[in-house]
Curated annotation (Swiss-Prot):
Binding site for meso-2,6-diaminopimelate: 358, 382-385, 433, 437
InterPro entries, sorted: Folylpolyglutamate_synth_CS, Mur-like_cat_sf, Mur_ligase_C, Mur_ligase_C_dom_sf, Mur_ligase_cen, UDP-N-AcMur-Glu-dNH2Pim_ligase
GO-annotated molecular function: ATP binding; magnesium ion binding; tetrahydrofolylpolyglutamate synthase activity; UDP-N-acetylmuramoylalanyl-D-glutamate-2,6-diaminopimelate ligase activity
Gene3D superfamilies recorded: Mur ligase, C-terminal domain, Mur-like, catalytic domain
Modified residues (N6-carboxylysine): 204
Name this polypeptide is given: UDP-N-acetylmuramoyl-L-alanyl-D-glutamate--2,6-diaminopimelate ligase
Localization (cell): Cytoplasm
Length: 463
């Protein structure tokens, strides 16, 4: 990537930053126009950022022809050039709940009158305006810093971002000065990349090393942070933010207490949220705790702002009522378990698959989880990518017992229609895995596909 921005570093001026060796190679050939620079632009005018991904591509010629900076120095460069408008950076990591927690924090801070940027799975937003479309949960380091520059130019008070395990391991967040780091939970995901659950947990925990404010889930057994200054929130265990009583039948209703580090009760407040499930109660607590730590606003005022949050598209999204149809992004065992737990008082039908070319170890567990809770199960494709949909489905089935109400249909649209055709008025249909994604990846082709649109079209055709 290349960012065309004038920056100063060590008493020198540069017209751009890049972490792509191909940019420097093109400049050496007098072909700077390939990357939007002047054709004969000098390599001395482009600051090259070394990182974990590009270090093996840096040839001696590249090393000798341009100025280089380590990735962890980027934050200092940014602050030196834009320090008068530096926002408070809030990083949220965890297996599940990052997107919803980030969105709640963003919503509450906006309601409290702050200028806020939000970066994550759903894209890049500033003050309710989408700046960039969906991309990686945490983008490349240079794109991340480009987004920070935009937030600074817009005079944002806060920069809320999701932090993936890939980004932590690949050092895409190196050098960032976080005002607050938040943990939602640690279960299991991306074992195709991290190779073991122990390594995955280690990576997640590494985010909380060092100094700085931290807000952690007190009920999470796999957080190993020993920082005595850390804040905690919890449902089962008491923390700085705790639940005194709660109900989940019609959204979230409860009463919460905020305690400072001496654990004397300072504030209490009722809370209401248009969200379903215990997992969303955790997300809500994380968000409330974060806003309290960051702003010191009265707890009741934060709770009032929470009531205006309408949910996240594709996260426990109600697409149809009577019968009830929910679309959600849940694509891990734990994510599915939390959704099923939210509807365990209902008769559940579920449509789901698993992504191809990704962690295969979770597939049997997902199948077993579905069979534990649902009385109708429709196994289909998610984003098969270059894997055979049939082999993915077989992996899911390997974790299940033979059942009369287990149906296999690799075509996702047909599977959804099949489930809708047999859906009874007293059942809830959960369509899991893709959430608000509007595409399906089959082979190397990305085609338009939206679970929600399929459901709406089905019911529209029957009116």
């Amino acid at each position: 990537m290349i960012i065309k921005k004038n920056v100063s570093y060590k008493d020198r001026s540069f017209i751009a930053l890049t972490d792509d060796t191909r940019v420097i190679e093109s400049l050496l050939k007098g072909e700077g126009d390939k990357f939007g620079l002047q054709k004969d632009a000098d390599t001395d005018k482009v600051l090259f950022v070394k990182n974990k991904q590009n270090k093996n591509f840096i040839t001696p010629q590249i090393a000798q022809s341009c100025s280089m900076v380590e990735s962890y120095e980027l934050n200092d460069i940014l602050m030196a050039n834009f320090s008068h408008n530096s926002p408070n950076i809030v990083g949220i990591t965890g297996t599940n709940g990052k997107t919803t927690t980030a969105a709640i924090i963003y919503s509450i801070l906006l309601d409290l009158g702050f200028n806020v940027a939000l970066l994550g799975t759903r894209g890049f937003f500033i003050n309710e305006h989408r700046i960039k479309p969906k991309g990686l949960t945490t983008p490349s380091m240079l794109e991340l810093y480009e987004n920070l520059c935009i937030a600074m130019e817009q005079k944002c008070n806060f920069f809320i971002m999701e932090v993936s395990s890939h980004a932590i391991e690949q050092e895409r967040i190196a050098g960032l000065d976080f005002a607050l780091k938040i943990l939602t939970n640690i279960t299991s995901d991306h074992l195709d990349y991290h190779k073991s659950v122990e390594e995955y947990r280690r990576i997640k925990n590494s985010f909380f090393e060092g100094e700085g404010r931290k807000l952690l889930n007190a009920d999470e057994p796999y957080i190993y942070c020993t920082d005595k200054a850390a804040y905690f929130y919890g449902i089962e265990k008491k923390g700085n933010l705790s639940v005194d009583v709660y109900a989940l039948e019609n959204g979230i209703d409860g009463y919460i207490s905020w305690r400072e580090r001496d654990y004397k009760t300072n504030e209490q407040s009722a809370i209401q949220a248009h969200l379903y499930g215990k997992h969303n109660l955790y997300n809500t607590l994380a968000a409330i705790g974060a806003v309290k730590i960051l702003t010191q606003e009265p707890l009741e005022r934060i709770a009032e702002a929470l009531e205006h949050f309408g949910g996240v598209s594709g996260r426990m999204e109600v697409v149809h009522n009577m019968p009830l149809v929910i679309v959600d992004f849940a694509h891990t065992y734990d994510g599915m378990y939390q959704i099923f737990e939210s509807f365990r008082h209902c008769k559940i039908a579920v449509v789901f698959g698993a992504g191809g070319d990704r962690d295969k170890s979770k597939r049997p567990k997902m199948g077993a989880c579905a069979q534990q809770f649902a009385h109708k199960i429709y196994i289909t494709s998610d984003n098969p990518r270059t894997e055979s949909p049939k082999s993915i489905i077989e992996d899911i089935l390997s974790g299940m017992q033979d059942g009369e109400y287990v149906f296999v249909e690799a075509d996702r649209k047909k599977a959804i229609y099949m489930a809708l055709e047999s859906l009874e008025s007293d059942e809830v249909l959960l369509i899991l895995g893709k959430g608000d994604e509007d595409y399906q990846i089959i082979g190397n082709e990305k085609i338009y596909f939206d679970d929600r649109e399929v459901v709406r079209n089905y019911f529209a055709s029957r009116t």
